[in-house]
């Protein structure tokens, strides 16, 4: 294995790669080129994504003073009349029941998530619109205007009109400090526009058990305003190095590599892959996902939607390599969950930074937070772990996902809007 190759590849990939954009396509072609350079064929698989077009958005405090606050529109949430809606304002904290009993005819703000359940409760109680937040309390003026354009994932049967906007948490703080009485929201959009995103897929056939497949996945898209070096250029180059490893050391089992597009808008690339390859899923013995590796000053994590013995083994092998892993069982918000929801045992490696450490989903996610030695260490470990699974004498992976995980399957689908 070529030392620091992963870090050098990451430098080439560290640019904004938003779902459905030309830059995401540029990154996809870069990944294909990297595979082909090592003699592994790769191809792009396209899929459709929602791409709601926001044509007008604003949020204005009208009483007790008049002041505008920067925001972006929530795609697919709904829309106001052309002239907007003016209504009393209410802050509902994280949307707990204690705070939403008297929201009729109001525009509400939550610093929690606008879940499908909360959306329904607010609509049923007569709320007219909502504000959600993004970013941090201490973000500077630049960050306060770098609010991404996100869209909601309403429930499958939800055709309601409930317009929403998003603002930076610091901006929201300033709004609350004005003791708002009434606000005016304007949101106009076209909900029906579609876009195109892509997965990149490569494969090396196994020489002994080609019918048994291990899939390595990582999303390669980023959010707006971010180079996405940590999230998730790092995971993308990790599986590229695993691909290098098996190109140089032919595997007993087939290894497949899926660089997923559009993870940042709801696991859409991995979900599309599973739906486009339904018949092939039965041959996948394990999905190993990588989301955020090799950052400076962070703890290593391993997550499992699979038999706990696999996760315990990963943690044990980490000890042999002098690496500690915190572990957790269940569905996690990354592409491994798409596989697990389609009954493929799945796991994911990642890192978590301390409070005040490296950030994701902002302009601060750059190469400055990455460390070539940290990345090299985790890449070498992951290649060794991958080899253990791929080259095992017998398939070591139980095919059943434990019931204490699958009991939350439908709720997880609902959470991510995966149908």
Where are these regions (language model features)?
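N-terminal capping segment at the start of a domain
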Residues: 1-23, 38, 45-47, 140-143, ...
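Catalytic-core environment of secreted peptidases
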Residues: 2-22, 32-42, 107-112, 129, ...
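Noncatalytic luminal/extracellular "stalk/propeptide" segments of secretory-pathway proteins
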Residues: 3, 8-107
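Second-shell loop/turn segments in exported
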Residues: 14-22, 32, 108-113, 160-162, ...
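Extracellular/luminal Protease-associated
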Residues: 69-156, 161, 325
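Soluble metallo-hydrolase cores and metallopeptidase-like ectodomains found primarily
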Residues: 71, 75-97, 148-229, 244, ...
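His/Asp/Glu-rich mid-to-C-terminal helical/loop segments that flank catalytic regions of hydrolases
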Residues: 244, 356-419
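Metal-dependent peptidase/peptidase-like ectodomains
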Residues: 260-359
């Amino acid at each position: 294995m070529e030392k620091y190759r992963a870090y050098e590849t990451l430098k080439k990939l560290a640019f904004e790669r938003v779902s459905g954009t030309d830059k995401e396509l540029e990154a996809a072609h870069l990944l294909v080129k990297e595979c082909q350079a090592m003699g592994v064929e790769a191809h792009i698989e396209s899929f459709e994504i929602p791409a709601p077009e926001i044509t007008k958005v604003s949020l204005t405090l009208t009483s007790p003073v008049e002041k505008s606050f920067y925001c972006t529109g929530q795609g697919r949430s709904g829309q106001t009349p052309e002239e907007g809606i003016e209504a009393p304002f209410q802050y509902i904290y994280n949307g707990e029941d204690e705070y939403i009993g008297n929201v009729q005819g109001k525009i509400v703000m939550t610093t929690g998530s606008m879940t499908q359940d909360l959306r329904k409760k607010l609509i049923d109680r007569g709320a007219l619109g909502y504000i959600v937040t993004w970013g941090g309390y201490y973000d500077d003026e630049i960050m306060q205007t770098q609010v991404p354009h996100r869209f909601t994932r309403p429930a499958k049967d939800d055709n309601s009109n409930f317009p929403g906007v998003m603002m930076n948490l610091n901006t929201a703080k300033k709004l609350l400090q004005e003791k708002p009485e009434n606000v005016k929201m304007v949101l106009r959009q076209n909900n029906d526009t579609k876009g195109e995103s892509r997965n990149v897929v490569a494969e090396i056939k196994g020489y002994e058990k080609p019918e048994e497949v291990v899939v390595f996945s990582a999303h390669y898209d980023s959010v707006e305003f971010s180079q996405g070096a940590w999230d998730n250029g790092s995971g993308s180059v990790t599986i590229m190095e695993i691909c290098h490893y098996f190109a140089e050391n032919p595997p007993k089992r087939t290894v497949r590599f899926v660089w997923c597009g559009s993870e940042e808008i709801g696991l859409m690339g991995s979900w599309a892959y599973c739906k486009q390859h339904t018949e092939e899923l039965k041959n996948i013995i394990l999905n190993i996902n990588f989301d955020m590796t090799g950052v400076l000053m962070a703890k290593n994590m391993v997550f499992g939607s699979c038999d706990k013995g696999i996760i315990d083994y990963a943690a044990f092998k980490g000890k042999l390599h002098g690496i500690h892993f915190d572990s957790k069982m269940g569905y996690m918000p990354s592409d491994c969950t798409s596989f697990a929801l389609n009954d493929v045992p799945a796991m994911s490696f990642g890192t978590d930074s301390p409070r005040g450490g490296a950030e994701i989903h902002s302009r601060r996610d750059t190469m400055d937070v990455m460390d070539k030695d940290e990345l090299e260490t985790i890449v070498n470990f992951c290649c060794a772990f991958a080899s253990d699974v791929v080259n095992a004498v017998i398939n070591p992976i139980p095919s059943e996902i434990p019931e204490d995980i699958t009991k939350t399957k439908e709720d997880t689908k609902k959470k991510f809007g995966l149908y």
